[in-house]
Amino acid sequence: MMATTAKTIGRDWEQITDGTQSVLVQITGSADVCDSPVKPGEEQAAHCFSNTVLNVSPPTAMWIRSSWFEGNIRIVVS
């Protein structure tokens, strides 16, 4: 398990897990989330989540960015 950390995320995709970790992700704001072994492209299909908590487990390689209508979002990961 990783230490609890907080991040501000914008429109650029950021990797949260690499497919080997189980994490708890709290999202504040509206986020696009996808599973990809490499950095997704601009038009990548994604699930939209708002103000929620996700349990992410292997083999999911989680990427996240703020939704198109949102400025920045805040996530807390542990």
Feature map (PLM): residue ranges:
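Surface-exposed loop/edge segments in extracytoplasmic proteins
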Residues: M2-A3, K39-H47
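Surface-exposed ligand/attachment interfaces on beta-rich extracellular proteins
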Residues: M2-Q21
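Short, surface-exposed beta-strand/strand-loop-strand elements in extracellular ectodomains
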Residues: Q26-E43, V77
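Beta-sandwich interaction modules
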Residues: E14-Q15, H47-P59
